[in-house]
């Protein structure tokens, strides 16, 4: 029951943030949406969008990790915000910025899925599929392909015929 409460809390946090961003997008207040995303980045990890895009993904993961454990709540929020940021850049006709946001978001979602198979309940897998669609015109970097391969290795068909995942050691 505690795990379900945790997952619901994550979903509520992400949902609230997205609702505000979607509102700004609908009224075409793109700068307002980007400012909100930047503020949420600062609240979550103590750094704004510019800093998050300037650091390596390894550094970002280190910022979201405590004692070797990825903070899934923060990682999920950051990944979702990066995807929303990419959508805004795409709406503004800035494909280079959209690509960077989408790619970092995709890699974070993949890391999340590889860390905790319980988060499939939040439809994180559909986020990955959506991002892969947005990035299909690009050749994915080797690290992203490695993460995808690891995820595909973890996928299996359960005895009841449903699709499931299991986590394998990545070290």
Predicted regions and their residues:
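N-terminal alpha-helical interaction modules that lie
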Residues: 1-78, 82-92, 99, 103-113, ...
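Alpha-helical adaptor scaffolds
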Residues: 107-153
């Amino acid at each position: 029951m505690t795990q379900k409460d945790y997952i619901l809390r994550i979903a509520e946090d992400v949902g609230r943030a997205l609702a505000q961003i979607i509102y700004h997008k609908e009224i075409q207040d793109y700068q307002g949406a980007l400012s909100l995303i930047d503020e949420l980045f600062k609240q979550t990890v103590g750094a704004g969008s510019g800093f998050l895009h300037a650091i390596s993904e390894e550094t970002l993961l280190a910022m979201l990790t405590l004692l070797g454990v990825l903070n899934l709540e923060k990682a999920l929020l950051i990944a979702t915000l990066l995807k929303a940021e990419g959508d805004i850049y795409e709406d503004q006709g800035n494909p280079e910025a959209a690509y960077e946001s989408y790619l970092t978001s995709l890699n974070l979602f993949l890391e999340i899925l590889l860390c905790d198979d319980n988060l499939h309940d939040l439809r994180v897998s559909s986020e990955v599929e959506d991002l892969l669609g947005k990035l299909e015109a690009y050749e994915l970097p080797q690290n992203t392909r490695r993460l995808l391969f690891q995820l595909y290795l973890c996928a299996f068909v359960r005895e009841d015929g449903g699709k499931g995942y299991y986590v394998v050691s990545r070290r």
